[in-house]
């Protein structure tokens, strides 16, 4: 029988969670990781090979170590089981035995990527020295410091180079890899750079080596295997005289408790305790208290806020028992704060300071078993819980889910409550409605035993109204005293509904409670003054209205009953009206009932529509406190009636009565619409406040992007961060004209593009996803190229739908000289953009430019070049687009054009063929006078553009061939006050420059002389004629080249039999030489094109345009008249 052969161990390619310790005496000065035998064999499968191994390591337990770092790995058989040792001279010299982190994640690395580009920064003196050495010598110095060969230097972004006092500030395509001679190495000066976390440039956290650490006591004793140790009867703290310690209060996030303490590594003795009683402190605080991590302490609160010198009676202070845990070192938390959850702080009044004292009975014999909470807090025998009235708790479709979540909340742990405490329970409203529609709506009363957790998006509130205790002969609960709810002993009764508003202590907001439960984030709409302009003024206006309305309603001395009705309107969709209302409701703790008019509308019956509204709203308005009733798309319920019909609008009448009824009961009624003019006059008159919401301005877009890009994660919880070279200012400028919803789409699309980019890199380098992600620190990093691609995709896909303007790609080089014209344009456009402060004191801006002259002289292209040169968005408006058969709609179209431009500023509005848009008033034959009204509206909008407020960043450019037909009012100062004549080139040198600009991408024959070609052209050629000349010359060259190739093919086929003759395609695929496909434009091609070209403007017509010019510029000097058209025809496209 053959012997058994042991199968080789397959390497484990997934991340491994294991124990870590810091080497206290690294003697070689190098950074690497030692793996014990079990870990090494698990991830690599072979202990006998001598290959150089690498791992990516992330330390767990401290916010200072949030990224993976790449290390060389070695085998160390003497290490304890399932553990590794980190050799880091920098961390060891700073922390030594104070380093208390115990857990890490190890990602095995099968291949380290070679870096294509690395940027290093050095001090000024070192920079000058490095300039004199070669790249090879620099690599040798770095390799010597790293203990590796010059061809494979392991380098990480933010690494500090001790020998040269330099720093690695950028790496591509990933943040960590091999630096070699093939790497593009860029050296910069270190001026203005700041080191952050792990040396991160401009980071938000300090370097871990710079964080002061206090000497900790044993942070957790339950998992150290000390159960067999015994002490004598004398407590280890018996000789300490411990006084109450005064601490400030900090907010505790649930993730902070799980990630930054050792509670998960401890025993399961805390699994059933209420995590709302868990507090976190720095280890130095535990030492002062004489406590271990996990001990019970007593906090005392006082409302006077006098601190340690408080003169209040100590017996009057409220005493509360909590359990305290130590934060792992190193960390950047405040050592003078006690971190508690905002839910618990709200229940005790959110004191500014507390007095913390160790319980005297804690560990009396020095044992290592934490005392139980039941020894200090009594168990309640019965508890009565009432629902707090809200649109959620009053909704029958959500009843089963929020009661199920309430039951789970109390059964999962032994909760600690006090009388009159308010308890929030997260609920997924989408899941609740789905369960109701699946079971109850179909008549099935049986509910599923196991309910999915879902993704909570709202809070259902409950209140402890009454109860009895097991002791004291079943007396009622005492206010302010703690009680434990033991599911096995306590009887819980859910009964009644209370209409109270959930009270919050000073310093705690409803938004902080949402953040604690990790509910969907809401944009805060900050009101900031940026460049002398307030951001989100409409949000501030809505805040003031809602605040005053609730304050008057809550004022018991006020006899007035204010009926508050607000209309939110916008010209664009998806600008965030509903998001704004939700945020304002959250800020004020109001009960928001949000309805969609299209869901309520019944076209066949007004009574059924009103009945549906009442069925959803009556109980909420009657039972809840601080109600906001919000109806979206209110124009669907209150359309403006046809004036030709005599039928009364009963829907509007009934809706108006409903609005009066609800507002008289104290509710705030808010409606929103995208077309305020479509609402009936009756309902429109009911709204006392009309707030217009515009597309976000550039500062507002930056704030929105900042919020969207903060703390991003993918669906699998992978962190997403910005690369340091991403500029939010640039993104805000590039996203001009886009709404908040569009920005959300752009960010999501950018993340998708970044993931696809990394997936392509993973396939190309044959590295799995986990390893590649660890090379970027375990994060997906968004680059400027990702955002540029996403924004361009958004504009290409949705430009027609959202009316988003684009920045054209026409440069000054495409247009040509125009020195005088450029100077005029710089004075008009560049000055307000670069120095807006000059116009902040009422000075009017000259924002109108009029190009006129013969057709084909590049007026349109010049306008596009303005937009490109100054990075402005570009709106092109044709005259017929503004005309509409309905009275008032043409003027409204003009208003919409200028409003879109204001939304997309900085922006250029270009009116092509302006004489068709704004002809002289009184000369038109239309019976309705629509053209006259368009001119009047255009004049009013132009005046608004030149004003100091609202028109900044919007420039108007017009083009016409007939300025004599324009209304004279358009040409006065402040409107189109800059008139620039674009004529034809009057010298052969200028014509040669035109041809040179047009042919700069051509392949010209060496014998071609553009000056001689220009000398053969008449002075009646416009820019469009020269474009036609060059295009025809290229076409002639292509025809000539094709003929020559056809001749070669015929000659080749002459000596071949009929069946062996080749085709043109075969010739180009197999036989043709490079010169056969090269198109060279020769002088004969230009000559032929010139002979066939007919000038677009005759000499008589040019004379007419010159006479028109003299009429408009008669007061100008002859020199200016001749310099304006210089080079005006240097274009590459028709007008």
From Swiss-Prot:
Assigned GO CC terms: cytosol; peroxisomal membrane
Name under which the protein is recorded: Peroxisomal ATPase PEX6
Main localisation: cytoplasm
Main function: Component of the PEX1-PEX6 AAA ATPase complex, a protein dislocase complex that mediates the ATP-dependent extraction of the PEX5 receptor from peroxisomal membranes, an essential step for PEX5 recycling. Specifically recognizes PEX5 monoubiquitinated at 'Cys-6', and pulls it out of the peroxisome lumen through the PEX2-PEX10-PEX12 retrotranslocation channel. Extraction by the PEX1-PEX6 AAA ATPase complex is accompanied by unfolding of the TPR repeats and release of bound cargo from PEX5.
EC code(s) of this entry: 3.6.4.-
GO molecular function: ATP binding; ATP hydrolysis activity
Family affiliation: Belongs to the AAA ATPase family.
Single Gene Ontology BP annotation: protein import into peroxisome matrix
Record text on subunit structure and interactions: Interacts with PEX1; forming the PEX1-PEX6 AAA ATPase complex, which is composed of a heterohexamer formed by a trimer of PEX1-PEX6 dimers.
Mode of membrane association: Peripheral membrane protein
Reactions listed under catalytic activity: ATP + H2O = ADP + phosphate + H(+)
Keyword Nucleotide-binding: yes
The keyword ATP-binding appears for this protein: yes
Enzyme class, UniProt record, top EC level: hydrolase
Taxonomy, superkingdom: Eukaryota
Annotated InterPro entries: AAA+_ATPase, AAA_ATPase_domain, ATPase_AAA_core, ATPase_AAA_CS, P-loop_NTPase, PEX6_4th_dom, RecA-like_PEX6_r2
